[in-house]
Amino acid sequence: MKDPADLRFLLTIHDSPSLLAAARKLGLTPSAVTQRLQQLERHLGVRLVERSSRQLRFTDEGDMLCARGATLIGQFDALLDDLHQRRGGFVGKLRINAPFGFGRRHIAGCVAAFQQLHPEVDIALTLSDQPLVELTERFDVVIHIGRLGVSNLIAHAIAPNARFVCAAPSFVAQHGLPDDPAALAALPCIALRENNEDVTLWQFNKGRTRQSVRVAPKLSCNDGEVIRGWGVAGRGVIVRSEWDVARDLASGALVRLLPAWKLPDANVVALTHQRTGLPLRIRVFLDYLKTQFRPLPPWRRPG
């Protein structure tokens, strides 16, 4: 395999759920993709993909080629970026993933502004709340909020983000203010289902004191905007990120409960596949993103 384009072609197939999806990304017909893949296999003398009518399954040799090839392509792109930097610019594609709500409110505008500053960079922003493991290989930068599980990704700090227990004033008028986390177990609570986490165990600390409470949600949803809306409507107690409810707290649409007790933070980070050797366009985007959230993120700015 002498042409990097062949390796990029194979990596596109590897990162696609089906042959049809790969064909769409490549701008080719499925038959053309199959034909080129067969030519590549004949040239290498090894089977790379087991094909069926419904799915693709890479062989061990195909997986090895893609794993090591992705590293080589990354190094090659970084080299080209450095050459462009010497000429005073950079080009290429930038694939970014962000959660739905945060992406709409805080990332989409940053992406559009960055592209306007650097018109030679093509940017594809994907909003998704899929589990992180399903996303990593498809994107150059993944915006992540909260605790990061076992991962080989590199986290770049973007912004601080606390989590609050909240309820609507109408809910507080009916049920009163809880004076201890344990009191939440007897109140109607609303849970956000995401990433296969235990969403009914809420953990608090006050100084060195730690307390966990198991809530029994009367309502749950996998969409944060729905959760916030239910909370504002007085349907129950919610736990939401500071970035999501800061305006509601400021306007009085929500009231913060148990302010003396702290939930684990859910800071905003940008994840990349490596710390060093990143292509210039990724490094510059990360620097730009940090400037948009510092010295204070939008949800902590006055007014």
List where the protein language model places each region.
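Short helix-boundary/capping micro-motifs
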Residues: 12-27
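Short helix-loop hinge/linker segments at domain boundaries
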Residues: 53-56, 63, 74-97
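Flexible hinge/capping segments at coil-to-helix
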Residues: 152-163, 167-192, 207
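Central regulatory/effector-binding core of bacterial HTH transcription factors
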Residues: 91-151, 302
